[in-house]
Swiss-Prot record:
Function: Catalyzes a salvage reaction resulting in the formation of AMP, that is energically less costly than de novo synthesis.
E.C. code: 2.4.2.7
Database matches in Gene3D superfamilies: 3.40.50.2020
Superkingdom to which the source organism belongs: Bacteria
HAMAP family referenced in this protein's UniProt entry, alphabetically: Aden_phosphoribosyltr (MF_00004)
Gene Ontology biological process: adenine salvage; AMP salvage; purine ribonucleoside salvage
NCBIfam families: apt, PRK02304.1-3, PRK02304.1-5
One cellular-component annotation, GO: cytoplasm
Keyword vocabulary terms for this entry: Cytoplasm, Glycosyltransferase, Purine salvage, Transferase
Pfam families reported for this sequence: Pribosyltran
Name of the featured protein: Adenine phosphoribosyltransferase
Pathway assigned in UniProt: Purine metabolism; AMP biosynthesis via salvage pathway; AMP from adenine: step 1/1
Length: 175
């Protein structure tokens, strides 16, 4: 049982980034060494269960959580980024958003040898970015073993678009 109440470090900001959105801000949590340590401790339990070879973090807050998690678990870290941010050859995927489209990329040689991959991000909302990352990991040669998020917005149904046979873990859930 944890003595750190992670939910108390999440600030709710109405109408950001646009009217009608209730934004869950992790920045107060990031300012607390105790809260960050607890997040990494809890996510490391997901690593123990899923046994990945690498952590893949989604730009940009997935880097903030994913890199220290990889370090804690003795694993490598691979960033998934927006287009044009990674040097060298990349593998990319285009995906649809609620109002438009976007693209994610990973270095072409990042997942050589079919490593087992845990995808990490700060937030699961509609699941579009996580689902695209799952496809990208597979396309780049990785074996996806699961997803881990700090926060899940359950009312947006993100789990429903992720592969059903994989572990999906979140530390905090909001309706």
């Amino acid at each position: 049982m944890s003595s750190v109440d992670l939910a108390s470090y999440i600030r709710t900001i109405p109408d950001f980034p646009k009217p009608g959105i209730l934004f869950r801000d992790i920045n107060p949590m990031l300012r607390s060494p105790e809260a960050v340590a607890e997040v990494i401790r809890l996510l490391s339990l997901v690593c123990e269960r899923t046994r990945p070879d690498l952590i893949v973090g989604i730009e940009s807050r997935g880097f903030i959580v994913g890199a220290p998690l990889a370090h804690q678990c003795g694993l490598g870290f691979v960033p998934v980024r927006k287009p044009g941010k990674l040097p060298g050859d990349v593998v990319g995927i285009d995906y649809s958003l609620e109002y438009g489209s976007d693209r994610l990329e990973i270095q072409a040689d990042a997942l050589v040898g079919q490593p087992r991959v845990l995808v990490v991000d700060d937030l699961l909302a509609t699941g579009g970015t996580a689902a695209a990352t799952a496809q990208l990991v597979t396309q780049a040669g990785g074996e996806l073993v699961g997803f881990a998020f700090v926060i899940e917005l359950k009312g947006l149904g993100g789990r429903t678009v992720l592969p059903k046979d994989l572990s999906v873990d979140s530390l905090l859930a909001y309706d």
